[in-house]
């Protein structure tokens, strides 16, 4: 069993991602939408009315044979204390970033908190279909403003392994010795 938290700056699409995960894992029959006020994890009237997550919520999902507690946290700065309480129990975090907005100040704050709590982080870049987004520029911004070890999951597996190996000394040694990172 593992605990995975979803964190984001406001309007990055975190709740929409949570709905998609719940739907694709078979936990819900139909994904809700923030603008339709029927998101599964936004259970309080005020959350539905304002279209924001105010309280952290948990949903249990099954991914393969693994049981996962998915924790949806508030993205609005006013509810940061609620989000931060959740960090103490996370095994992993997914930091959702709007590709259209780039690395916002609150994203940097979330990154520092996740680093302080030593929580491994997967970045999920959302809204890349919006006009003006540039994948390479965003990756460079992530590396400059968050961590130089941020890498993209490449479609080409070899390129991904090379980038991954460059982010950690032990992984690099393994990759150089036998061509794998596992």
Predicted features, each with a name:
Residues 1-97, 103, 144-146, 150-152:
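P-loop NTPase switch module centered on the Walker A-proximal segment
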